[in-house]
């Protein structure tokens, strides 16, 4: 969370609350990452997500984002839907990003991994701003479980197919 103000100005604060995404990795029984476009058996074209009655096919964003030429503290987070990308050189599929300022109350996202395999995500985000103080309560669960840190990625859901 970034805040900006003039020390003399008590009541005028600007808060920039970054967005967030749900991250997914699907491994086969041999441990191959099926979210990797370079994996011969990847399932990127088979998966989809349904949110608010809209079904999203996986967009290919792998390797297209580069660090901006100029540093900024602004967090622009347009909603992209379902996409494959990489985090610290590990391919994954993300859903979102959800706007950090928006309140979500157990919103449901159904992830379809193909072959009749579905998982249900629940997304919550509550932001309370009181002057210069910001309180954020955020949760993304899948089938009732919290995400884990593994394979070099933070907050990711790992499935075996």
Residue ranges of predicted features:
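Bacterial Sec-dependent N-terminal signal peptides
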Residues: 2-23, 157
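Short, solvent-exposed beta-strand/turn "edge" segments of beta-rich domains on protein surfaces
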Residues: 11-17, 34-38, 98-100
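Short amphipathic, basic-aromatic surface patches that mediate peripheral association
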Residues: 26-40
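Tryptophan-paired
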Residues: 42-115
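Glycine-rich, aromatic-bearing surface loops/beta-hairpins
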Residues: 108-161
């Amino acid at each position: 969370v970034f805040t900006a103000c003039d020390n003399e100005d008590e009541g005028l604060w600007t808060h920039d609350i970054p967005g967030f995404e749900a991250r997914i990795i699907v491994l086969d029984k041999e441990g191959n990452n099926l979210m990797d476009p370079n994996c011969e058996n990847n399932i990127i074209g088979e998966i989809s997500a349904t949110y608010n009655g809209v079904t999203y096919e996986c967009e290919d964003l792998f390797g297209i984002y580069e660090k901006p030429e100029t540093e900024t503290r602004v967090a622009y987070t347009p909603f992209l839907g379902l996409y494959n990308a990489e985090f610290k050189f590990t391919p994954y599929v993300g859903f979102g990003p959800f706007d950090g300022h928006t309140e979500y109350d157990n919103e449901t996202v159904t992830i379809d991994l193909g072959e009749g395999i579905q998982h249900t995500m629940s997304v919550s985000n509550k932001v309370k701003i009181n002057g210069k103080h910001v309180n954020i309560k955020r949760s993304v669960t899948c089938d009732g479980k919290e995400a884990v840190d593994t394979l070099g990625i933070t907050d990711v859901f790992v499935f075996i197919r």
